[in-house]
Amino acid sequence: MSKYRKIADNISVNEYSLSKFKNLECAIFDCDGTLVNVNRSYNACIKKTVGFMLERLIGGKQWYDLVSDELILKLRMSGGFNNDTDTSYTCILSALASGSKDVDTARNFALHVATKANYQGIRSVEEYLTKSGNGDAVKKAKNDLNYPGLVGSSILSTVFDEFFYGKDLFLKMHRMQPRFNNSHGFIDNDEVVISDDTVHDLSKLFKKKMAIVSGRSRLAIEYSLKKMLRNFNLDASIFIEDEEKEVIANHLQIRVNKPEPYALLKAMKALNARSAISIGDSAEDIIMSRKVGEKYPTVFCGVYGTGIDSDAQFKMFMDRDVDAIIENVNLLPVLLRSTIK
């Protein structure tokens, strides 16, 4: 018998979690796949970046067809790939380690590698490939791409950001002229999912205690969500891309990426909240919320309708026993009013 109760169309609540919805002080949102559909922006950027880099490294136009939606989804479901440049790096590394110039063979190998990934992200992939006799490929990829590394020093980080942001935003973001893209960016293909009505409704429910915890930069969030951000506390929001750059530049020993609890805890502290509902679409969002839940009452609500494979995403949420599942972030007010009665 299912432990999930359907309280409305496309809204399911874990019966064991119903009591957790009482007295939630704030709402903290993931952006990509939750507030914004990124299938034609970030996902497309991964595919182009990987093709571009492999063409430079080993030649051939076939590499633009390497990355499939299935491959991206498998990596994201591992819980360690909130950063899409990490995803691009893993796809490139897997293609190199496959030892084949046949794109189908390389893709199948990459899909196999994705099954070995876990919440440790690229570290888990590098360790698996090294142990399986592909240490030379790992060294080559790290050296050729200088990754992980900042834009300007790592060619992979630079290419990804140029393709995603486009000429003008890249210049604004990094204060350097682009070298690989003199046109618009994939960010222009972002599709905002959350409606103005939903944002206003939630802002009233939480008395304006709403923030965003996203792998994006603040610039990218502001560019896509525009005036809608007035209803979020941006001072309490955490933009992990920006935070990570500070960590790398200052050689700090802090892990800020999801699924580490750092960003969610920092946002809650800034909102002066001791309980939260976290809304996201990925495995790392679940893991992060549960880590925070060890200290503070935290509810996780999974959003499945804007991803690559909504059925697979819904199943993942059920398999991981999340507190609530909604097809679309605009159903969140209905969920909350049904559970806090």
Give, region by region, the residue ranges found by the protein language model:
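Structural recognition of alpha->loop->beta junctions
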Residues: 79-80, 230-248, 312-336
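Glycine-rich phosphate-binding loop signature in dinucleotide/nucleotide-binding domains
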Residues: 21, 205-208, 270-274, 293, ...
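Extended charged low-complexity segments that act as oligomerization/scaffolding linkers
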Residues: 55-103, 239-245, 313
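Substrate-recognition element of Asp-dependent hydrolases with the DxDx(T/V) motif
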Residues: 34-35, 39, 46, 147-153, ...
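Non-catalytic pre-domain segments flanking phosphatase-related domains
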Residues: 1-29, 65, 77, 101-155, ...
